[in-house]
């Protein structure tokens, strides 16, 4: 009788052991050309100064610039001892900012990689950061688990505004791109929260009380991510297992709903191909037809929750709790090939195994006869 020599096995249920074994087996796959990092990856942003590179934030408290083609770490940003949740670059691209579990926003000089100013003011985890230029001044905007949004002067570190109104923690911040194009004197900031509300405010604000304006309530629970497409429509990803497209011209009314089997962590729109790409807690990256809302293909490779996605040219770059960065091509030929390969694999798995017409004893006798013939 086999007995486990692993002490932790005695404290796990059969289901949890099976899940651990499943993940261990799946972790060996090379789908998406995985780049393995030391710890869980919680955020990703583009590197505007280096094509083919991205910045990622890790649970170990480090941020790094990774070259996608080689997997090389081109720059490492250290200092925090708590997980980093979010990233942003200053408007001039010279400073990297990271929201941290230590309730502050860290910053580094991109070229020297040396830590710079820390921005303080939150009483709980910082969950999201973004940057903008407002009336000629560069500002850092942070959202925290304390439900506050703080606008800082990047140069001085001064807290310019503190916006309140959400009832629970901020999950994401997104600047309306149309507000940047139309009026250089200010911007419009959208915020998503665990209270299921999406709110928006002008920066500089007319009031520090976000609750004075009507929120958008289109989800049943937490909204994790916001994404503006080229038409200015707002895409939302939620813990209610849906992604929704809110039409700007129809007062932000949903005109498309994408149903998922689990929490949806991120969404992006690939304009050139007409695809919507989503990241889900069920470990999958999905590609949807934007016009019809139909699921076209599912990229499988991650073996833990997918925490974020980023479009780099015609490639989807995904990150995960499994500590890998993976890449998926959306070029028409590559996407069609991936879809056909996935369908062929599914057909093979569904093919019933033919049962032998022989009894176990007859099969044994046949095997012995074949050995004798040799």
Model-derived features: positions:
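WD40/WD-repeat beta-propeller blade N-cap
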Residues: 34-41, 77-84, 119-126, 164-170, ...
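Short loop/turn segments that connect beta-strands within beta-propeller blades
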Residues: 68-71, 110-113, 154-157, 203-207, ...
């Amino acid at each position: 009788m086999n007995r486990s020599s692993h002490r932790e096995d005695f404290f796990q249920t059969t289901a949890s052991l099976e899940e651990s074994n499943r993940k261990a087996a799946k972790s060996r796959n090379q789908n998406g050309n995985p780049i393995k990092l030391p710890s869980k990856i919680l955020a990703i942003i583009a590197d505007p100064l280096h094509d083919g590179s991205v910045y990622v934030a890790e649970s170990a408290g480090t941020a790094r610039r990774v070259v996608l083609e080689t997997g090389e770490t081109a720059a490492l940003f250290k200092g925090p001892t708590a997980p980093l949740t979010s990233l942003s670059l200053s408007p001039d691209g010279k400073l990297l900012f990271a929201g941290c579990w230590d309730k502050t926003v860290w910053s580094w000089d991109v070229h020297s990689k040396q830590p710079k100013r820390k921005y303080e003011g939150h009483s709980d985890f910082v969950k999201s950061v973004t940057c903008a230029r407002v009336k000629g001044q560069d500002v850092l905007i942070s959202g925290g688990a304390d439900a506050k949004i703080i606008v800082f002067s990047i140069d001085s570190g001064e807290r310019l505004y503190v916006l309140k109104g959400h009832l629970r923690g901020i999950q994401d911040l997104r600047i309306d791109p149309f507000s940047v194009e139309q009026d250089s004197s200010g911007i419009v900031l959208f915020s998503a929260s665990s209270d299921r509300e999406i709110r928006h405010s002008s920066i500089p604000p007319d009031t520090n009380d976000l609750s004075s304006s009507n929120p958008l309530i289109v989800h049943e629970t937490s909204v994790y991510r916001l994404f503006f497409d080229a038409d200015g429509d707002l895409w939302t990803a939620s813990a209610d297992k849906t992604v929704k497209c809110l039409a700007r011209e129809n007062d932000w009314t949903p005109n498309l709903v994408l149903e998922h089997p689990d929490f949806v962590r991120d969404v992006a729109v690939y304009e050139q191909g007409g695809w919507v790409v989503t990241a889900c807690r069920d470990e999958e990256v999905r590609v949807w037809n934007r016009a019809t809302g139909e699921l076209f293909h599912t990229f499988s490779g991650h073996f833990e929750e997918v925490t974020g996605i980023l479009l780099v040219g015609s490639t989807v770059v995904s990150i995960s709790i499994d500590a890998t960065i993976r890449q998926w091509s959306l070029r028409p030929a590559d996407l069609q090939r991936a879809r056909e390969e996935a369908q062929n694999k599914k057909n093979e798995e569904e093919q019933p195994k033919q049962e032998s017409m022989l009894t176990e004893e007859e099969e044994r006798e046949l095997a012995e006869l074949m050995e004798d013939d040799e």
